[in-house]
Amino acid sequence: MLYLFRKLADIVIKRPIVVLVIILSISAILAGFATQSVSVQDVVTGDNELTQALEVIDDVFGEPTSVLQVVLESDKDIRSADALSALNSIEGAIHQSELSGTLVTDSQQPAIVSFLSGVEQAAQEAGIDPNYLDDDMVVALRQQSLEMLPPQFADLFESLLGSGSPPTTGLMLVFQNTTGLNSIQVTDQQRELADVISAVDITQDLTVTPFGFGLLLTANDPGPEIGRLFGIALVIILIILAVVYWFKPQAGQRRMIFRRTAADVVMTLAVIIMAVIWMQGIGVLLGPEYLNIIGHFSPQTQIVPILIVGLGVDFAIHLFSRYRFELGSSGDPEKALRISMTTTGLTLMLATGATAIGFLTNLFSPVSFLATLGVLAAVGITAAFLLTVTFLPAIRLILDRRAARKGGLPLKALASQTEGGLSRIVERTAWLAERVPVVTIVIALLLTVLGGYGFTQLDNEFNLTDFVPKNEPLLLTYDTIVEKFEGGFEERTQVLITGEAISPQIHNTLINQIAKVKEIPGVQSFGEFADANSIVSVLGQAFSTDLAFELASLGITADLRVSDDTDVEALYSLLIIKVPGADQVIARSDNDDLITRVDIRTSAGQDGAATLAANLNEIFAPLEETGMKVVATSRLIAQARQSEAIEDSQVLSLLIALAGAMSLLVIYFTINVRRPLIGILTVLPVGLVLALTFGTMAITGIPINPVTATLAALSIGIGVPFTIHFTSRFLEERVKENDCGSALRRTVSQTGSALTGSALTTAIGFGVLITSSLIVFQQLGYVIVYAITYSLMASILVLPSMLALWDSWDRRHHESPS
């Protein structure tokens, strides 16, 4: 490996222009592919029985209707004449618009209903002109109309009035025909209808907000938010880089130092930009349009450029820091570059490998976009490394050769750069390793145990609304629907039932279990029954038609059960042919297997989704005893399952990441210095980083979610490079120094100060995420700052103590420290 870096250094030294041309050509080619990237919303995906059931339901039954919930809010009782007038205006605008043709026309389902439906009819029956109603009359007539309805219908209309005394919110439901439309087209159709409703002139005393969950998730493109965060992070990091790269000039050299600092900052910026371009281009090549190895880019994977900014800048800092030190010592740019490439360059390769391993553990994540994110991050960090060891040294060498010919190299200033205040402050931490290494390690172990306990206390959450900006108005509307209307009318839970054949026993068991669904918490009722579409509702509709006699002849009784000799196959075929809507609950697969579903209106929400699924599966368990397969599923249930899967995969991801990084380092240090134990010691402090980060997350209330679930990868990606840099430099210094203390002090002074500068840069850069309007990115910002802080502490406080004890043991067992 050292031979390869020597050859690479030779190429850069002999042909820097050629290196630059090759790098810029590759960047131009990949930039062409980068422009082809497509961003696709991808959050709740995965390959499990829940998502597979949702796909079957979508393919076989589809969703023939969608409901747009229109929330009316007022500072006073919403049962008012103004609200009635507003509802009439909205309904009139809908019927007069081009979207009137999208309204459902089913006689069993009115296209538009509201909390004041029936008021005008009650007024007309009472001989009152609806145009002259006052608020009190509206309240009275509404109550009168409800009393005229069957109890189940009265309960339904009552649920359209928000809770509170007096109620200040009410709902209008607009049902649209969505046959043949996919989810994107359904949302687009709802958005057009929402625009029509929003354009209606309503009295200022009322607020009218059309709402659909699809509208909420697509209301804001996260792209501009990511772009803003990327831009801010870049600007802040560049400013800090200027401070980090600046060093005290000698007399008359201020302008020279300024130009050099500015050039280093610009070169680092170029590396970051090209690394992002390479990541985007290679991501397209690996994506569905070409190699189909990873998924599409998504709004969530667009956070990768910010990761590249934070982690990629670290490479430039370390390479420039070592190069400046060697240049100041030797005065020869070529010699300084060769030493830097074969020492720091090799260390950067190890850090890149460990970081890539950490991110690639996301391939084991049950959330598909995390797998894509992991691959993209690994590609981006690898690109940053390649550019750092080719583009940066090539252009720096060209500039320094030119400066050397003109006598413009600030050698004395470069030689004195490690004597700064930061180096002296950091050097003092070596006292712990020299005087109390055992105490330091014991304290670290205790903190690791405490952090591990914090890990057991972490919550797991997977809410799609976390991907919606906090200032999005529709998010407030969503909260209103959850609070005032028990989640509203969009939440549906499906029970998919499949099997090879249907028998009287299976049919009767299905009827029996459907009757019990109403007892489950979170299931909305319609009179005495659960508000659900199922074989029960289809049979009830059939009995109200002229099919009643034919059904009776087939063996259907009044309680919808069948006799033992009933031909249930023929019964279901008759229902599909003769009863409108029966094909929405009964179907046949391509293999002629039975597929039926129970489509239930629920209000369990995210928190109750898992419990609801468990209760439904328990209710329908007797069907499985008859040979049928039962799966209770919904978008919320799938999210809950994903949350559990993320938690379960955390330990596996951690073990894989740590084992991979440790194996890499053990192999390297075995080959390079014949000290495999060093590889293990270098990774061990990362365990402290993980434990403390998890513990701090528990203290600050940050849960495990699809974004913070990248913590294993991030901690490996941030922590291992820190410890690798320190260990590698220590091994160099212990060869030069006979005294372990001197080697530690020099390592802490030189590498420790670079690590501190790098940590400061990346922490502030990633800290920009804390300003995001997206909760998950805010949380990720905090988590990364935690990980960076603890990685720095572990590398300059804990690792030196471990190396001090190892050095003492190693010198007793080996004649040479090399």
What are these regions (language model features)?
Residues 1-42, 178-460, 604, 614, ...:
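Membrane-embedded transmembrane helical bundles of large multi-pass transporters/channels
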Residues 1-262, 402-655, 808-818:
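Feature of extramembrane
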